[in-house]
Every structure is written in C-alpha cells, then in structure tokens.
Amino acid sequence: MGQKRQRDSKSSTFHAKKRKKAENATAPDSDDGWDGIVGADELNWKEVALPDHLEDAGGFFGLEEIEGVDIVRGSGNGEVKFKAVAGKPKKSILKKKAPEDENSEYDEEWSGFSDDDADRPENASSPAVEKPEKSDTKADKKSEKNADKKEAKDAKKKEAKAAKKEQKEKGSAIQHDTSINAGLSFAALQDTEEDDGADVSAWDSLGLSPEILTGLSKMKFASPTSVQEACIPQILEGHDVIGKASTGSGKTLAFGIPILEHYLEKKRDDISAEKEKKSEKDSTPIALILSPTRELAHQLSKHIGELIAQAPGVNARIALLTGGLSVQKQQRLLSGADIVIGTPGRVWEILSTGQGLIRKMQQIKFLVVDEADRLLSEGHFKEVEEILNALDRVEDGEVPGGENQASEEESDPSSERQTLVFSATFHRDLQQKLAGKGKWTGGDVMDKKESMDYLLQKLNFREEKPKFIDMNPISQMADNLKEGIVECGAMEKDLFLYTLLLYHPKHRTLVFTNSISAVRRLTKLLQTLQLPALALHSSMAQKARLRSVERFSSPSSDPSTILVATDVAARGLDIKGINLVIHYHAPRTADTYVHRSGRTARAGASGKSVIICGPDEMVGVVRLAAKVHANMANGKKLPLESLELDRRVVSRVKPRVSLASRITDANIAKEKISAEDNWLRNAAEDLGVEYDSEEFDESNGKGRGRGRGRHQKQKEVGSVSKAELAGLRAELKQLLSQRVNVGVSERYLTAGRVDIDALLRGEGNASFLGPVDPLHF
C-alpha cells in the first residue's frame, strides 16, 4: 500500500481561515457561540399589506409577519423564541443593524485649517498619523474600488445618453433633408395629398389643441356633432356636465376629447417644470369611465384609443377592466394607466383587493358615467355605489391636532374632480315596466327637474347645479329612424320574423329577444334556414361574445349577417351598417326600446325598427308609444306604423319555417335530455348509487308536480330518430333551393308580370320569384 500524502500546511491554514470567516459571517457580532435561537425583538419583521377596503381592519392595522422561522419553546419559563428553518441563512431573519464605521475618524467632515495646525512643526505631522491596520486598508481599498466602479458606470451612462441624443439630432436633420428633397418630386406631392385628412376648420371654435385637431383630421371627422359642440366647451371650462342626446350622436368623443386635452396640458406642465419621469407605480390615472356592459366598455376603449393613435404626441395609456378576462393582466395595466375604462363589477373587484389603488383613484380629475340611467337604476350594479363611496371617502388624520389639515389635503382631489354623465334617457318613468296590472303613469317623458334631482341624489357633483345639456327635449329617437309594428298570432312569430328577413336581403339585421333561451333557439332556427346568424348573450364566454361582435361588424363579412341578442347589446354598441332592428319580443321598458332602436340610424344615417307584436303584448306596445312619443306635435304622424306583409309570401314560406322549427326543437330537446342524463349519472356516481334512466323516467312521469307536461313534451320531441331528422333536412333543403313563388307560372314565365331581363341581371329581391312590393314606411 502506498503511503498517504500529507496535507500542505499552507492549504490547511487557508481552509481554517475560510471556516472561521464563514462562522463569523453567520453569527451575530455580540455572540461567538451563537446557536441560532433569538427572541422576537431581534427578528426582521415585515409589515402586513392589507387591502384598501378593509381600512384599519377593526384596529388590527399595523400587523407584522415573518417567514422562514420555527418556534422554539423554553423548557422552564415558557418564553417563546425563534430560529431559522433548515436551509435558510440564519442572518436573513435578523434585524439589519446599522453598519458601524470603523474608519469614522477618517470620514469626519473637514472644517478648515486651525491655528494649531499652523503652529505645529512639519516633521511632527507625519508621526501623528498612525498607520491603519491591514484589515482597515483592505476595507478602504474595497470601498475605493466600489466607488471607482460606480463612477465608471455613471460615466458610461452619461456617454450613452449623449450618444443617443446626438444620434436623434442627426436622424432628425437627415429626415428634414430627405423631406425637403422629397418635396421636389411630384410623386411625393401626390402621396402627401392622398394622406391629407379632412378639413377640421369647423372645430376651431372649440379651442382644441393642434394634436387633437390632427387626430380628428386623420379620422375624417370634419365637423363636431351638436352634442360635442355643446358639451366640450363646458367640460374644458371645468363644469360638471349632464349630457342627454339621442343614440349615435357622438357622446363618446364629447367626453373623450376633454380628457385627452387635460392629458396634454398636464404633459406640458410636467415638461415646463422639468419634472422627473414618474415610475408606473407612482403614476395616477386622470379619468375613470364606467360602463354597464362589457361590449360598450370595449367600444369606448377602441374609439378613444383610435384618437390617441392618430393624434401626435398623445401617449395616454388605457386600462380596460372587464369581466371574463385575466385579472392579473388588468392589474398590471392599471398600475401605469392614464385612463381607466371598465364595468363596475371588475373595477370594484380590483380596487377592493389592491393596496393603495383607492387612494390613487381618489386623485382622478374626471369621473364619467356612461349610460347613467342604467348604471344608477335601483336594484342594479351595487358595485357602482361602492365605487362612488370609495372615491368620496375622506379619512381622518391620525394626529389629533392635524385632523383638519389632513382632511383638507385628502379632500382636495375629490373637490377638483369633474363628474360627467351621459345617456339617451334619464327619466325614471321610462324604466317602469310596460306590461302588468300595476299603476301606470304616463305624461311628460323629458322632465328636466326630475332628471336633475334623480342624478343629484346618486352622484356627488362638485357644483351645486351641474350643466344640463339636452340635445333632444322633444323626442329622444333619431330623426332618420322609421318605426313600424307587425301584428301576428302568438305562435307565428318565427314565421313573421323569417318573412321580414326575406323582405330585407343584404341588410345587416339585429334581432332582440327578452331571454337567453330564445336567443339560442332563434340562432339555431335561422342557421337551419341557411341564414348567417350569430348569437350574443351574457352567458357566453367573453371571448365568444367579442368574436360574435367582431364577425357581425366586420366589413368583409356577409352583408346579410344577423345578430340575435339579448338587451346586453342594446346600449352603446356602435356598429356601422346596421339597417334593420327587429324586436322579436316587445321590450319590457320604454328606455330599453329607445336604446334598442338606437343601434340603427346612427350619425345621420337612416334605419328601421320593427316590433313583432303578439296579442298578449299589445297593451305594453300601446303604453310604449304613449311614453316615447308623448310630445309628438298634434299627432300628425302615427308613432308606430302598422306594416302589412303579403299573405301570399307568408303562406309560401310557412312549410320552410315549420320544418326548420321541428328540426331545431328536436336537436335542442336531445341536447337537454343528454345533459340532464349526464348530470344525473354523475350525481349517482358521486353518491355511490346505481342509476337507471328508464326507472327514473317512469317515476318522474307518475308525478303531478309543476313542469310535468313540459318534460313529457320535451321527451316526445326528443324521441325523433336520426333517420327522421335526415328526412326533414332533405325536405327543407329542397324547399330552400327554390325561390319563393308568388303566383308565377314556372312553365310559362312570359305569361305573367315577371321581368325576365331583371331576373337574368340579378336585379330585385333574389328570394322571390315574381313581383313583391317592398315595405315602405
């Protein structure tokens, strides 16, 4: 065996020193034999961050916590001590002590020459200075090295900034030269002419900044609408504004432009004061815009974002807070946002669970309540009240002597806040249900005093009397809107809906219903009839809702696209090209009818609104006409014109609708039975019992409870076999492949009144074979 090699004495002393250093680093300064057990006072406690809505949490504000420690109980006196968990550095749980400066005698501030220094001999000065120890010189060298590194880094940063500045100046000079040279060629002149926007001289009277005017020019907004012309100057002067205007009149930019003007003014003030750029955490938003629906919130963000993108020098950031999307992402967006747009539920969820967010929101300069009559209606949107209370909350100062001063400082931001309220309807009487046997109150639809009192009770305006701007005191319906009513039997609504759609080919149509189940059934019915139908309701996932709106509003989509929706699409949805609005169910309230019909005839365009009215809805429709058109002059024109559909057309399309209804009802019943069966099977598995579907159906059929007849009918409809469904589909396909014949001989085309040349050219309504008079109203 070989002899074991002896360890070098130098390396052994080196390792011993290393171990000694490590022990000294982990142990406290006072104790050399420290076992890692310390008292509560020696721990590095951290303050607990509480959500804003807890306020002081009933006196528990100021709680502290620590992580990574184990509790050690004393054997005799019961004193509780702590030690670091395994794997955690022991020094990390201790309080950080202020470092004692060993070289303090060298770091004293120089106070100038004294007389003693002048009297002292030269050779006596050198021995007076004692040489520091070796360790001290090492520490000095280390600190000097760190200082040198820091200085070098700072110098590099300054050089990089200077280089960037020079590069920018050179780039701008080059760009200027190229633009001058490009101006000499005619091609460049043609390009500039094509890129020129609209003439915005009509906006000059509003006193807008050049940046905003440039954005409006690029967006082709040549002149302001009436509501914009009336509201923007009042908002820029600092007044609280209540704006009432018909749907599609440009209310979004009426409050969006003043918000961006304030952003630019604030930006100029910061530049003139040469303020340092704040971090995202320190920035506070300037505006909060509340919307009743997610679709309207997305639309507001889109419209204001387009103006921001087109206006040079406007870099305002928008945070969109709506349900159905990631909360974490929205919290990150909110941290650096200038404008916050959202629905009340998600806005309050984020504000109430965050730290310091409510205090930030209390400093906003604009609070905008869009579609205020819906947001502030009784029994809806409880979160709106929570948000308003949080914005107006004033906390008392902790110091008794400084309570007044603290309250004044905290109340200043809310006193500077402008409140802007916009809607097409404000009258509370419009929210009364039209159907039912309760007491019905008619009368003046637009009472300014009642509208003002109603809003003053709900909102904390800065001014005692905010500016009330009413752009349509007589009628809230658009001027170019034509309203009609189609009377039908209770079971014939599907038939008359399909007939109305055939009368209006290549029309983008919006169909409103009062229930989600009706949306689902009608969408499948129209798709079975080979019509491009889309669904939109509140039970859909947010991405599916956005997808439906995008497909419906896309310019490249089929011009005959139909959107079947609940009242979630009734407010604020601005989709270009909607020609027809059909109310499959009569609206429950008058304000709902106003907003539903407002999806068409927007921004000066024409449109039609038609109610399909059954016998049981006639009373509600009569009340609706009395409420909405109460102030019509002398009753010269009927508010809702009765439409008579050609009975030949109705009778010819009836077989199509009957087949499509049978197919749709069978598919829906099968899906419902399958879903119920799966639910019962899973419940039986969870309970550990056997499930027999036939036995369950027999016991369910013997009962006499509520819904027995509906279940029986559903079972009968769902019992249609696949072969029968295939036969029904084939028969329907055969009918849909032919045009609707309205009394024309297919053998002898020239014998009737058919214009063969027009048929060959594809003119007229392609759904019908023969002349059909269009619906004029």
Swiss-Prot record:
CDD domains (UniProt xref): DEADc_DDX24 (cd17946), SF2_C_DEAD (cd18787)
Main location: nucleus
Entry-linked Gene3D superfamilies: P-loop containing nucleotide triphosphate hydrolases (3.40.50.300)
Biological function: ATP-binding RNA helicase involved in the biogenesis of 60S ribosomal subunits and is required for the normal formation of 25S and 5.8S rRNAs.
Swiss-Prot/TrEMBL keywords: ATP-binding, Helicase, Hydrolase, Nucleotide-binding, Nucleus, Ribosome biogenesis, RNA-binding, rRNA processing
Domain of life of the source: Eukaryota
Residues that coordinate or bind ATP: A245, S246, T247, G248, S249, G250, K251, T252
Record carries keyword Repressor: no
Ranges of residues in domain Helicase C-terminal: 496-646
Chain intervals with Acidic residues compositional bias: 101-119
Compositional bias (Basic and acidic residues): 1-10, 130-171
Region (Disordered): 1-36, 86-177, 393-417, 692-720
SMART domains per the UniProt record, alphabetical: DEXDc, HELICc
Originating gene: mak5
Compartmental location: Nucleus, Nucleolus
GO biological process: rRNA processing
The protein's name in its UniProt record: ATP-dependent RNA helicase mak5
InterPro entries in the record: DEAD/DEAH_box_helicase_dom (IPR011545), Helicase_ATP-bd (IPR014001), Helicase_C-like (IPR001650), P-loop_NTPase (IPR027417), RNA-helicase_DEAD-box_CS (IPR000629), RNA_helicase_DEAD_Q_motif (IPR014014)
GO cellular-component term (any): nucleolus
Cystine residue pairs: none
Catalytic activity from the UniProt record: ATP + H2O = ADP + phosphate + H(+)
Motif Q motif per UniProt: ranges: 201-229
